[in-house]
Every structure is written in C-alpha cells, then in structure tokens.
Amino acid sequence: MKTIPIIQIGVGGVGRALTQQLLAHGDALAARYGIRFEYVGLADSTGLRARRLGLSVSEITTALAEKAVGQPLSPAGAFGMGWRSFILPQRGIFIDVTAAGGHEQALAERVATGHRVVLANKKPLSADFSAFQALTKGGGTRYEATVGAGLPVISTLQSLLDSGDTLTRIEAAMSGTLGYLCTELEAGKPLSAAVREAHRLGYTEPDPRDDLSGADVARKALILARTCGLPWEPEQIQAEPWFPAALGDVSLDEFMARLEELDAPFAARVAEAQAAGGALRYVATISAEGASVGLRVLPGDHPLASLRGPDNLFSFTTARYAERPLVVRGPGAGYAVTAAGVLADLVATARELRA
C-alpha cells in the first residue's frame, strides 16, 4: 500500500465536496489501486490545519465544521506562511481548489522539488506564460477541473495532440452561468430578472460582474490555447462584457439596482437572433490565428445553439475530425462534478507516484 501525503488549499464549496468524496471513497481506491491518500494539511487564507503524520478523520471533519461557522483554520501566526512553508514528509500532492491569485510561484516551486500539483483554480495557469510552463513542466501539474468542471475536456484535448492529430479550431460555450442567462433570455425573461435570480440561486459569483465580464471564460480559453502549445499571454484574449464600462466602476448595490438599463439592449439582441432562426450564445473560439470570446448569434442547427441552462459544450475540429468535430458536452459547473474532476486527477497522479 502506497500512502500519498496531500495538502488541500481551499475548503469552500469544491474543497468540501472533494474532502467528502475522498473520505467516502478512500477504502475503495486503496483496494483498487493500492493507494491511500493522507491529508497532512488543510489550508486557506485563514491559515493551515496540519499534522505531518496525517490528520485524522475527526480532525478533518472538525476543521470543516469550524470553517462552516466562520472560524479560521489556524490561529494568527501559526505555521508561518501556511502551506507555502509546510514541508511534506515525502513526495506528495498539493491541491488548489481556491479561486485565489498569486499561488503560481509557490506551486511551481513544489513541482520543481518533485512534488505534484492538481488544480481546479484557473488563475495559476492563466497568469504569465512562464508560470504555466513552470507548473506544467514534466507533467508536474494536472488541471482537468480548470475547464469544464468534471468533463473530460483537457484530457480529450491532450489525447488528440498526443496521438499526432492537428487542431484546427476549438469552439466552446464554457460558462454555466452565462449559459443559464442565455436560456432565460430566450424564454422571454428580462436580463435584470435573470441575473437577480441567478444571483439568488448562487449560480453567479457574489458580484455577478465577475461572471458577466467574461474574464472567467477568457481564462479557460487561455488554458486551452496553452494546452495546444500556443505561448499566449493573458492580454492576447479579450472578452466581451455584458455591461458597459460605466457599470464596472460602481458599487455592487448600484450595479444591481441599475440592471434594468441592460434589459432593452439584450431583448433586442435576442429578438434579432430568434427572427433569424438562430440563438444568442456566449462563445469562445480558439485557433492558431487567435481567439475571440463574446456573444454570437448562431444558426439554429449549430451544436452550441441546442444548449440549455448551465450545460457546457466543447467542439474540437482537427485534421481527423474535420467533417464532424469531436464534441464533449455536459454539466460544466457544480461543486460535486468539479470535485470529481479533481479526484480523477488525484488518482492518476498518485498512480504515477506509485509506479
């Protein structure tokens, strides 16, 4: 039996789901692969709860329960720089399931010293290209869950490239939030009402502009482009926002109060698309020539036009899949499916460490 020490950075929605899945399926993974994951640390911006010889199930569940009521993971000053300064007892895996920036250097240092990294956090891979190179050098980082949650998007793309296929174009709708809004708009709901409902249901970020800016889709597009070998920097992909610049500078309360200003323009765009027999979708297109991220009117028979709600769809046009692109489709958001994508990467990484 091979024991793999892990430190998990992030104990929010995805982090909690991942911990629950690991605790629930740990015995099955041990029986199937001869691998046992051992939590030596749980970390977030409030600190680090750690034990070099491994946290007990009781300690893990207590930490999560305390976090749920607003307590920090560790007292001020405990463990110095938290997970960044913690030394694993042997070669192990650092898991980043946060949405925080600024982790790329520390994670790359772990890769350089022989540890592995598994990411659901997009920001380390969508920073400077040099950071992407440092993280992914020698296969030191797996990142399936950064694009498409638990869908096999990154692995499909890598398999196509590894087999010698040549990519022509990726076309994708990869925001569950924006997909939901498009569906609601097509049903006749004003954008203001759709955004408020999505916000109430927790589909959006606390500030919906984080979704409506398109920045999250641009990060995913950049990760896909870099996976294809394109050495792009963040500024090479610009996203079309759903709101004018003037609404980007106001407070959240004012933004929510002024959402009705967007109703008429969006109703007109939806009506125009429907009159043409098409559908309005927020689409990312990636090729060697460049990328575009924004709202597009698609023909009614386009695969992306059939999407409903928060589902994602990724279409890969390649030399081998030229006439009928290879399509990956399914839920592209949700704590459980995202955690499952992280867990699959963890198992694959652990099997490599065991070999």
Task: List the predicted regions and their residue ranges.
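N-terminal glycine-/serine-/threonine-rich beta1-alpha1-beta2 phosphate-ribose binding loop
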Residues: 1-112
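Conserved active-site and cofactor/substrate-binding residues in soluble primary-metabolism enzymes
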Residues: 9, 13, 17, 37, ...
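Predominant activation on well-ordered alpha-helical scaffold segments within soluble catalytic domains
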Residues: 19-23, 126, 133, 154-158, ...
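General beta-strand structural signal in soluble alpha/beta enzymes
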Residues: 93-96, 119-120, 141-145, 169-172, ...
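Rossmann-fold NAD(P)-binding glycine/threonine-rich loop
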Residues: 100-113, 120-160
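Rossmann-like NAD(P)H-binding beta-loop-alpha module
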Residues: 136-201, 215, 222-223
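Catalytic, metal-anchored helix/loop core of enzyme active sites in primary metabolism
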Residues: 169-174, 179, 197, 204, ...
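Substrate-binding/catalytic subdomain of NAD(P)-dependent oxidoreductase enzymes
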Residues: 184-185, 195-306
